[in-house]
């Protein structure tokens, strides 16, 4: 309650000075409208104030305007305008703008893909301490994208991101340990996956669950596997949703619950996991965890069959006879 009152007062002060023409206040008021600080979120109103701040020469406003135009958030999508504002902010040293411009070059978003140019801007942002850019620069050197592959040049950038507590960097370190050489270092991988998982990084949560499930790098623990599969599944990782469904279906690490299994098979099936589509079809076919519905069964068997899942072909032939 008190915090809400303070946020509202803060927003009112920003508005007062923004309306008096103070550019910093205009930018801050725009942020309030983006994040819903002391006011209901309103992307269009945010863009209005960011434009005012941008006109007064606030580089951070240029950066945010670039994001808004690229995403179409609060304004009609316009890639050319978005890139213009991002580049303007990047050239003025805004680290986030430098990173976003690098991403545009890396993925060819709104301009021709240019990995060399991407590395140039990643390096500028990384040099200012932005952990996202430090990680991407590590990956570029690690896999030779835009620069010659050089693990000795790569590693310090990963360490810089790790020292800042960046969850995705923890995951990258774990991944590197897991797949290092012929045998890897699974125990070290689990250590880093766990660090990233606890910070909420979904792919690390999934990989940690797999380690607990299969006893790789740690003692097998079905209950912990279920816990981390669920965490990753709730963040939309399709493979985790499929594995979580299997936990509920078989009572592995959690009490058997076929209705919950169907829920997660459905989530994974919607994301295109062929085996989840088959299993969902099976549940509809035999009324396992859900009311029997042969029409739905055929629908999901067919989706799995279209991806080459052989068992689905057999089940379809049986139902369509």
Across the structure, where does each feature detected by a protein language model lie?
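TPR/TPR-like (Sel1-like) alpha-helical repeat modules
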Residues: 152, 161, 193, 293-310
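Hydrophobic face of amphipathic alpha-helices that form TPR/SEL1-like repeat modules
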Residues: 28-35, 63-71, 75, 100-107, ...
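Terminal, low-structured helical/coil segments at or just beyond the last alpha-helical repeat
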Residues: 2-6, 306-321
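Canonical positions in the second alpha-helix
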Residues: 17, 52-53, 88-89, 124-125, ...
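Short helix-capping/linker turns of helical repeat alpha-solenoids
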Residues: 19-22, 35-37, 42, 55-59, ...
């Amino acid at each position: 309650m008190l915090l809400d009152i303070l946020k509202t007062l803060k927003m009112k002060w920003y508005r007062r000075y923004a309306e008096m023409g103070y550019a910093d206040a205009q930018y801050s008021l725009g942020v309030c409208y983006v994040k819903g600080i002391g006011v209901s979120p309103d992307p269009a109103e945010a863009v209005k104030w960011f434009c005012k701040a941008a006109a007064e020469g606030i580089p951070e406003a240029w950066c945010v305007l670039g994001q808004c135009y690229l995403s179409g958030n609060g304004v009609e999508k316009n890639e050319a305008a978005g890139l213009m504002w991002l580049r303007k902010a990047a050239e003025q040293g805004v680290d986030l703008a430098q990173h976003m411009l690098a991403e545009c070059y890396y993925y060819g978003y709104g301009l021709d893909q240019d990995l060399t140019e991407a590395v140039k801007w990643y390096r500028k942002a990384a040099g200012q301490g932005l952990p996202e850019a430090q990680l991407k620069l590590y990956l570029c050197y690690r896999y030779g994208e835009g620069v010659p592959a050089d693990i000795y040049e790569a590693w310090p950038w990963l360490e810089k991101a790790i020292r800042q507590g960046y969850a995705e960097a923890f995951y990258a370190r774990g991944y590197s340990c897991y797949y290092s050489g012929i045998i890897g270092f699974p125990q070290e991988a689990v250590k880093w996956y766990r660090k990233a998982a606890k910070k909420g990084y979904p792919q690390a949560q999934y990989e940690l669950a797999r380690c607990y499930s299969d006893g790789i790098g740690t003692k097998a623990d079905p209950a912990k596997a279920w816990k981390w599969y669920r965490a990753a599944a709730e963040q939309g990782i399709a493979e985790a949703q499929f594995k979580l469904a299997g936990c509920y279906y078989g009572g592995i690490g959690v009490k058997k619950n076929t209705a919950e299994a169907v829920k997660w098979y459905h989530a994974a099936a919607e994301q295109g996991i062929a085996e989840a589509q088959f299993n969902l079809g099976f549940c509809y076919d035999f009324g396992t965890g859900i009311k029997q519905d042969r029409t739905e069964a055929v629908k999901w068997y067919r989706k799995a069959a279209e991806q080459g899942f052989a068992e689905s072909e057999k089940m379809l032939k049986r139902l369509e006879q």
